[in-house]
Design a protein with these regions (language model features):
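His/Met- and acidic-residue-enriched segments that coordinate or traffic transition-metal cofactors
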Residues: 3-8, 17-178
């Protein structure tokens, strides 16, 4: 299966640092509930990691605060997913071709090697694209492919939070101007 920059919460594909929504498509035939659980966990973990960097390296208080909020929110959502996995006695199974791990490593490398306003722009651009890809994957691929009602409910429940994250990052990015 090829999901490209959309883990845990679901979708990821990095062109420079931004996930590609086109590459984030997951077909129903590609995933089952254990795979969805693994993707859900990875997507949240990876956004925690990028956001932890922003909480430390952001050049403005707004970017640092956004990174801290995103990290906190994704830790809570990841824990909800892990609690559900335990309750359902599911063993998360990462996709066979989990290229997302490579994509995430590239994003982390770029964020770690950037600073100042360039870091802020790279992080915010990444977060907007990442959350767009995740929202697309949740709505168009994961929810339709999910068999378990509780897992589907969790995916649907986190959708508005992903939307809010995307809009918050977009507002800060728009405020940066050119």
């Amino acid at each position: 299966m090829r999901v490209t920059y959309l883990a845990g919460a679901i979708a990821l594909g990095v062109l420079t640092l931004a996930p590609s929504a086109a590459n984030a498509r997951v077909t129903r035939a590609d995933v089952d509930d254990p795979t969805i659980c693994a993707i859900f966990d990875a997507a949240n973990t990876w956004d925690i990691e990028t956001s932890d960097i922003a909480a430390k390296k952001g050049s403005t208080k707004e970017v640092r605060d956004l990174g801290a909020m995103f990290s906190r929110d994704h830790k809570a959502v990841r824990q909800q997913g892990r609690d559900l996995v335990k309750k359902l006695h599911v063993t998360p199974t990462p996709p066979k071709d989990f290229a997302l791990a490579t994509d995430h490593a590239q994003a982390m490398k770029q964020l770690e090697s950037t600073s100042g306003k360039a870091f802020d722009r790279a992080y915010l651009t990444h977060e907007v694209a990442y959350h767009k890809a995740v929202i697309d994957a949740i709505n168009n691929s994961l929810v339709p492919a999910t068999k378990n009602a509780e897992l589907k409910d969790l995916e649907v429940k986190v959708g508005p939070a992903f939307q809010a994250h995307m809009l918050a990052a977009q507002r800060l990015l728009d405020g940066m101007g050119q």
